[in-house]
Amino acid sequence: MKILFTPNWTVHHLDADDDLIQPPDKQVVGQGYWFFKYFPKGYQVDIIDRGRKSWFRDLEKKIKFYIKQPIRAFKCRNDYDIVVSHGAQSGLVYELLCSFVKNKPPHLMFDIGGLNGARINHYETPLIRFALRKCPYILVHTSRQVDFYREHYPELAEKVRFIPYGVDCKYFVPQPSVERTRTILTFGKAKRDNVTLCEAFARIADKRGYRLIVVGEPELSKRYDYLDEIIFRSVIPLPELMQLMAESDFIVIPLPEFLYSYGQMSFLQSMAMGKAAIITRTTSSRDYIEKAPGVIGVEPYDIDGMKHALEEMMDMTDAQRDAIGMANRSYATSRYDEREMSKAICDYINEIVNG
């Protein structure tokens, strides 16, 4: 089976592996790509990414839609058994182009961002309905998005499939030999509510010798420059981040509320590494954390709730945090491993192509 994959990011094509680049962002010669590498033999995956940085890509970023990528995919669509687009930025444009022709393979669109950020209004919604009037297949990583489609795009609901996100649990593993540094770690460069976390940490009178490391939002440093216990860092390479994860006593992933998928990679990687965690209960996280044995859930924007959760984690012994952290790993590996996601996606693709 020939699959054309159009991700909404740039894929680096490498002759040799580079550990500084995460798997979705790289394709190494002679190796399978991302979750497709677990597909059985007989599948060929070609990639058309969003392209290198240019003035035109800057324009696409402003209008929040990709143009060149879906046009390239449209031109070669009939060379493939299925086109899989990751993200509506190009998926909607590709689907719009295909709606005017008869000859086309089936189209599976990963809807990560709720089509247009899950906004419903008199301007965008009719345009989206028009673009999707031929009803492509849609994959989401949070179950509440299925309800969103039932309510606002009922004609598409039967073709929406919830498949949980998965991370590489053989790569993200506990590192018990790494010495702890009495730190709390949070990381992520987008869609984080670090203000709630920092405010909650600031209100704790007895910080028990803890420092909070915030990776990914250095611009907040001026706001909290009166607190030596909060350290802000820019985005760092993955190996360095994993070292900080291993050194931390526990991890916090503070999330704002949106009606789509975000933050899942971060908290599942943390759980796979055997870390106790505090995670905000949002549309994106509820499917994954409600039954997680080593996660304390906090409501969005709840500073007092975050403060109590931090104090609860701080008051645990190292042995207690290690125990619930390893329970998190068992939970994540049994439900949210990348291989399980790959199998579910492969089965769905076969169902689409073969009827």
Regions found by a protein language model. Name each.
Residues 176-202, 213:
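Conserved donor-binding/catalytic core segment of Leloir-type glycosyltransferases
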Residues 291-304, 311-318:
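Conserved acidic donor-binding segment of nucleotide-sugar-dependent glycosyltransferases
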